[in-house]
Amino acid sequence: MASDPATDYQVDVAPAMSRRGGEERPAAGLGPWRLGLRRLRRNKVAIAFGIVFLLLVGSAIAAPLWANHVAHTTPFENHLSDTIEQDGETVNVVSFDGVPIGPTYQAEFFLGADPNGRDVMVRLLYGARNSLMIGVAAALITTLLSIVLGLVAGYFRGWVDGVISRAFDVMWSFPVIILGVALGVSLQLGGLQLGPINIAGDSLLIPTLVIGLVYVPYMARPLRGQVLSMREKEFVEAARAQGAGPLRIMFSEILPNLASTILVFSTLLVANAVLLEAALSFLGAGVRPPEPSWGNIIREGVNRVSTAPHIAIVPGAMLTLTVLALNVFGDGVRDALDPRAKVRVEH
């Protein structure tokens, strides 16, 4: 389902420029963020896909409204023995042969039912909530850890950088999907104890933490490289001369200069995290049934693809659209903040 994530990122930082007469010139009166926003507004494709993503988020947020006031069911309720009126006829939600009803395009079972008699539309919307929530939360965890580790490794260098870099090398030696499955299955079986906090194996926090951890090297290393180049800049030397300590220099002087890079990586990380969550759930190492996720809904539909193809096709299409929208919008943000920047993904 999912390909390996980025194994090589290149980020080149360029000053904000405007084009005049075929030459790149500084945009007078505009800061880099305002200039970036202006560039982004001109990128109609990126804006369109950004709107698509917002619509997907809105549909996920509205899942309880659809379930409670339209479909009148829950993502866990089965209707194996129920019937429904369709085209003037009374039909079983699930036939005696175990074949679920297809899309009715009406309030109940709008996209049909699954083999357990559950409403596919309701589960799709709740699955979107879980998949997007895990993707965003995991990207946030990755971003926070990457910022701290990248700053510490790049600023202190020496043995500190060596220890952190070797840990990244170990994680980088495993394909992300393999590392994610190994961690996911292990934590599902035994849960996770964080001091007084006990996280159950079937909690949504488990795949969130797993995905958040496995992507750290792919963001932290580029940040480390930029910190290494910035620590010798004049503004850092000036801060040292004024008596600023390492923490102040890292978080007050260097970190603001990494903001555009962090924003670009974070946007693309959400797409990778959503895709990896679906892959882990499909393989049984992510969100555990009966809790819905696009990945486990697709898994349930694979065995019924000949009799009920909608169960696998619809969530697959939603997953594809979400990842495409995030990637296109992320590319637009990258181009807007720095037209010469490269965030390259090599497999």
Tell me what each language-model feature is:
Residues 183-187, 198-199, 211, 268-269, ...:
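Glycine-rich helix-loop "coupling/hinge" segments at transmembrane-helix boundaries
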Residues 1-147, 151-152, 159, 177, ...:
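Gly/Trp-centered helix-boundary motif
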